[in-house]
Amino acid sequence: MASEGDKMLGGRFVGSTDPVMEMLSASITIDQRLAEVDIQGSMAYAKALEKAGILSKSELEKTLSGLEKISEEWSKGVFVVTPTDEDIHTANERRLKELIGDIAGKLHTGRSRNDQVVTDLKLFMKNSLSVISTHLLQLIKTLVERAAIEVDVILPGYTHLQKTQPIRWSQFLLSHAVALTRDSERLGEIKKRINILPLGSGALAGNPLEIDRELLRSELDFASISLNSMDAVRQRDSVVEFLSVAALLMIHLSKMAEDLIIYSTSEFGFLTLSDTYCTGSSVMPQKKNPDSLELIRSKAGRVFGRLAAILMVLKGLPSTYNKDLQEDKEAVFDVVDTLNAVLQVATGVISTLQINKENMEKALSPEILSSDLALYLVHKGMPFRQAHVASGKAVHLAESKGITLNNLSLDDLKSISPLFGSDVSQVFNVVNSVEQYTALGGTAKSSVTAQIEQLRELLKRHKEQA
């Protein structure tokens, strides 16, 4: 328990803090992940203080040297956290004083933990977004390149988990890749708003020392400077935006995981997951559990929970800084870690799974060509609504006879519509079926190939911006 004299900010207090209160308030076990960016911010601020005449050149040199020593201790894992270290800021400042003496007390001149912590968090998020973007782009690339290799593989498409129309396996892969490109774009968009410097805003009223904020911006590599000091220290829009984008990304990853889980079941048998990403059963030795995909699916709920929690924290706060905002960092750290792990595992799953072409072909039952039968009649001049009814009658007739749709005789079909001719047999060919969909975005080979090329170009642009 810290005594009155041990408190870094304890000048106006009498007595000791309740140890339970100290435990509740302390965040050092969580926010020590900000150690390096906190030091970066302090180095930049020390230079600004020297320019403002608060630090002499000699004091600046000692301060920077001390901060470099602290950075080295953190990187080597030898920094010692003490019971009086409430958070990463007080820990670093306490250690700096041990190294360079009372000069360390000048470093916080004109600076508040309010603008310090939000600067640290933004620096952390900038770095993290770059890493997440790299992992996301690698996953998209893996999907796209696999689609290019397996472009001739055809399987049933599904709605309501029922067979609908034949599609290319590549069309399925690209459907997920395209969704993920939007997530990549959103990550780039929020990075622009994160890239605004809050340091120099003080507690809420601004900085009274004519601190050169342009110097701070340049030193910390921010794109611009916050316009209003009160808004700068209170805003956690960037946290909410990041968690929101993360939640949407996890929806897309969860959906992909669910599809692959279904396709990998013995009932479907469309693909086999690598043993690297599966586990066995503790009771049933024949089982191969898709744990990797199930964990991806479940982690989506974890991210949603973090977003919901921070929204509830923020919704009723008055202006500027409140201690409630301490909750933001744990949410960000957890979601950053979750995304990095999930994206890498998803990439591994996609790159190592094996498709079972025979099972995909076996699942291409003639009934999934009933819409093609309707299109056949449309090409013969029948309005689509009538053609749809006629095709449905053909399906019903085949079911009542206990045969497949393609085994109906020409007489059977003519009993439904005289427009059916001997060329109707061409309808019952899955390659012909998928090749009808040549419009941009369709499942014809030419369209799929065009999608692949467009996505490759998009990946190049996103990689340059990451």
From Swiss-Prot:
Species of the source: Columba livia (Rock dove)
CDD domains hit by this protein: Argininosuccinate_lyase
UniProt function note: Delta crystallin, the principal crystallin in embryonic lens, is found only in birds and reptiles. This protein also functions as an enzymatically active argininosuccinate lyase, but it has a low activity.
Tissue specificity annotation: Eye lens.
Residue runs in coiled coils: none
Official protein name in the record: Argininosuccinate lyase
Site (Increases basicity of active site His): E294
GO MF terms held by the record: argininosuccinate lyase activity; structural constituent of eye lens
Pfam families (UniProt xref): ASL_C2, Lyase_1
